[in-house]
């Protein structure tokens, strides 16, 4: 119950008052993204394998001494997010927003792969359409079902990182 109240307070605080009055908006955008990911992912435990730290999925050939410290988890998150930002560099001001989303849903889900076409979100951004709110929020499903906490996460990400 405590975590639900904390999440609701966080979301309401961001959504209600003007952006300039909040300390989080004074942070560089990359730091906002890191804070947002940490808040919603939490620090993963052994039971969350193959996810460690703040949502890093262990890849073939990667080996880590577990459990990770918060400092190690933070460094791993930053490394992963920087890597994704580079992958989305051609999207300019949207690169951090897309990297943050890809951190959670996967690069292939957005950009397409053998199993999925390029997402509608990416298609709209590539065409210059800035009306992406609904398409971004649509990435709130797990196993085909809408998850309210993921939906809230997407709204917070947009509030913190989207530039019209």
Which sequence ranges carry the predicted segments?
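Surface-exposed patches in mature extracellular/periplasmic domains of secreted proteins
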Residues: 45-49, 87-97, 135
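Early exported N-terminus immediately downstream of N-terminal targeting peptides
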Residues: 49-52, 56
């Amino acid at each position: 119950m405590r975590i639900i109240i904390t999440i609701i307070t966080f979301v309401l605080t961001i959504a209600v008052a003007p952006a300039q009055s909040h300390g989080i908006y004074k942070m560089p955008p990359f730091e906002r993204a890191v804070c947002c990911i940490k808040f919603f992912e939490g620090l993963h435990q052994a039971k969350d394998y193959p996810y460690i730290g703040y949502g890093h999925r262990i890849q073939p050939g990667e080996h880590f001494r577990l459990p990770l410290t918060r400092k190690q988890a933070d460094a791993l998150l930053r490394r992963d997010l920087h890597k994704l930002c580079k992958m989305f560099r051609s999207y300019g001001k949207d690169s951090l927003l897309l990297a943050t989303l890809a951190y959670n849903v996967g690069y292939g889900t957005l950009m397409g792969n053998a199993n999925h076409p390029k997402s509608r979100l990416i298609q709209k951004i590539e065409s210059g359409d800035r009306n992406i709110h609904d398409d971004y929020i649509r990435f709130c499903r797990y196993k085909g079902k809408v998850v309210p906490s993921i939906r809230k996460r997407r709204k917070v990400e947009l509030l913190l990182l989207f530039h019209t």
